[in-house]
C-alpha cells in the first residue's frame, strides 16, 4: 500500500521553510500532496490559484528528483477531510521551535480524535530556515525589503511584482 502524505498550509507565500519540509517529506512517502488552504476569513496576498501554481512550480521538481509522486490541491474544509478526500494517511507538519510544537500537538490531538486513521508526522526545520515565517516575509515584502534569502527565486519575483510601487 503506497504511503500518501498531505502537507497542508496557506503557502502565502511559499517560503524556503516550506521547501525544507517538502525535501524531508518526499523521503517519507510514496506520494506527497500539497494542500493549499482556502479560508473565507483570511485575505491572502496571493489568490488560491497563484499559491497553487507557485507551490507546484517550487515543490514538484523536488518530488520528481526524489522519485515521489506529487500533486497540489486546494481545500476549504477540515484538514483531515482533505486528507481523506485524497487518500492520505499521513499529515506532514513542519516545526521551527517549541512554540510550533505546542500548537501543532494540540491540532494533532484534535485531528487524531476526528480521524484516527490519519497520523501526523512532524518534520523539524533545518537550522538555516528556522526563523523564516510567511508572515515576516509578507511584512518585509510590503515594506520594500529584499525577501530573496527567505523564499525561492520565483516567489521573490512574484512578491517584487506584487508590491512594486
UniProtKB/Swiss-Prot annotation:
GO terms for cellular component: cytoplasm. It is found in: Cytoplasm. Pfam families: CTP_transf_like (PF01467). It catalyses: (R)-4'-phosphopantetheine + ATP + H(+) = 3'-dephospho-CoA + diphosphate. Keywords: ATP-binding, Coenzyme A biosynthesis, Cytoplasm, Magnesium, Nucleotide-binding, Nucleotidyltransferase, Transferase. ATP binds at residues 10-11, 18, 94-96, 104, 129-135. Pathway: Cofactor biosynthesis; coenzyme A biosynthesis; CoA from (R)-pantothenate: step 4/5. It is an enzyme of class 2 (transferase). It comes from the Bacteria. Its cofactor is Mg(2+). NCBIfam families: coaD_prev_kdtB, cyt_tran_rel. Belongs to the bacterial CoaD family. Homohexamer. This is Phosphopantetheine adenylyltransferase. It comes from Nitrobacter winogradskyi (strain ATCC 25391 / DSM 10237 / CIP 104748 / NCIMB 11846 / Nb-255). The gene is coaD.
Amino acid at each position: 500500500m503506497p504511503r500518501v502524505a498531505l502537507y497542508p498550509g496557506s503557502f502565502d507565500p511559499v517560503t524556503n521553510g516550506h521547501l525544507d519540509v517538502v525535501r524531508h517529506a518526499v523521503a517519507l512517502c510514496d506520494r506527497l500532496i500539497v494542500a493549499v488552504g482556502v479560508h473565507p476569513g483570511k485575505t491572502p496576498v496571493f489568490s488560491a490559484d497563484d499559491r497553487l501554481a507557485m507551490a507546484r512550480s517550487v515543490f514538484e521538481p523536488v518530488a520528481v528528483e526524489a522519485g515521489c509522486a506529487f500533486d497540489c490541491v486546494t481545500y476549504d474544509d477540515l484538514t483531515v477531510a482533505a486528507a481523506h478526500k485524497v487518500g492520505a494517511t499521513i499529515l506532514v507538519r513542519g516545526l521551527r521551535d517549541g512554540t510550533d510544537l505546542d500548537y501543532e500537538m494540540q491540532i494533532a490531538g484534535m485531528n487524531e480524535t476526528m480521524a484516527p486513521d490519519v497520523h501526523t508526522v512532524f518534520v523539524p526545520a533545518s537550522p538555516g530556515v528556522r526563523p523564516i515565517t510567511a508572515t515576516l516575509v509578507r511584512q518585509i515584502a510590503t515594506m520594500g525589503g529584499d525577501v530573496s534569502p527567505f523564499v525561492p527565486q520565483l516567489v521573490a519575483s512574484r512578491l517584487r511584482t506584487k508590491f512594486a510601487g
